[in-house]
Amino acid sequence: MTGADGTYDYKAMAAGIVLAGGEGMGNLLPVVEKELLHYRILDAMMREGFFSSLVFQGGTSLRLCHGSPRYSEDLDFAGGTSFDMDTLKGLGSCISDSLSGMGDDVTVRVKEPRPDADGLTRRWRIAIRTAGQRKDLPSQTIKLEVASIPAYEPQHRPALVNYPMFPALSGQIILDVESPTEILADKLLSYACASHLRRRDLWDMCWLASRGDVDSRRAMELAELKSSDYGEEGLWADRADRVAGVADVIGSDAFADEMRRFLPAGLMT
């Protein structure tokens, strides 16, 4: 992907995508911009060899590797039980250099994990601003997280090119990504054990359950395994049946309001 020669003007590209999509894309400009930044970050990570110990997971992996129509925000990876931060040394500067290379008017800040951070997850927080951006508008912020947990069904595959009209996105990004069945397991566990309603996870669960290549029984088995990986066996045992009571959530105004930020209007009916 090209840099400061002006061929990766992500804001202009996103505006063109939204305009071409018609009225149904009107609310999606921020997440379209973010998706173009996802491509840029993943391309840089691949070129610098950071994928060797990581497996892509989460909502963005569904969108970029498995064809979900729902836009997403952050980048999530499984690093394995023996994950070592030293394997990602230089990741922050890799991301910063790549995003800064989009143009002289782009400012990038990458907040790296604390060296003494404990727990299962390490998080990089990436903030991007352009010179012409109104000061009252927030920076584009993307969280990149690596969890010290295993992936049980990794698949080696390319990221999808969602916008073939832009040559800057034509480079092939290849990485390991969890299977749709394993991602469903993650979503089941997250939805059941979270302290708050995770409406996007619920939408993803419904979309995954409709696919012919997803084994729902296997997903429940994996969710139980993963509850141990995350230290949430007790919560999972107590709340696994929470996923059965989703009809009221799906029919709520709050669910519709949240999903409007991530889905084209044609999928909201």
Residue ranges and their predicted role:
Residues 72:
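Anion-coordinating catalytic cores for phosphoryl-, nucleotidyl-, and glycosidic chemistry
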